[in-house]
C-alpha cells in the first residue's frame, strides 16, 4: 500500500500541529506548504512502524516498486528517482541529494500567471531566478537568504541546486515570464511517438 498526494492541502484548511501551532495549507502555490506531502508505505507485517524525514518525491515510487518486485530498470531509461526499499527494509538507504519542483498549473478557469521551478535539498530551496530559501524555517518562501552572506558550504549546495534547475528544459512556459500557453496549446503539442 503506497499513499501520497500531488500537492499540499487547500489554503482554506488550517491544521493544528502537535505543538499547538497552526499551519495553513498551500495548495496551488509553489511554496513548501504547497508541495510538501505525506508518503505512507505499508506492506502487512513486512513494512511498518518507521518514520523518516529524508527527502523523497513521486519519482521514487516507480523504482521502489520495481525494487520490491526484483525488476531491474534499464540504465538507458535514465530515471530521476531512487528506490526507497532499502531504507524501509532496514538496510542502508540510497542517497538522494535533492528534488526538483516545477510548478506550472494549467487551470482552465483561473490559470496561475507564472510558472516556477526550484530544486531543494535537506535544508534549502534554490529558485530559477537565484532566490534561496531555508524552507523549514520559511515554508512560505517570504525571506530569501542573502547569497552574499552565505557560507562556502551553502554556496556549494546552491551550485548543485542551480545545476539541477538549469539542466531541465522549460516547457511550455519559462518561470517568471507571462504565460504563453493554455490548455489548448499545451495539449495540442504533439510529443514524439512512443517507441514501445
PLM features per residue range, with description:
Residues 39-47:
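The feature captures the short pre-catalytic strand/loop hairpin that immediately precedes
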Residues 43, 71, 90, 163-171:
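A structural signal for alpha-helix termini and helix-coil/disorder junctions
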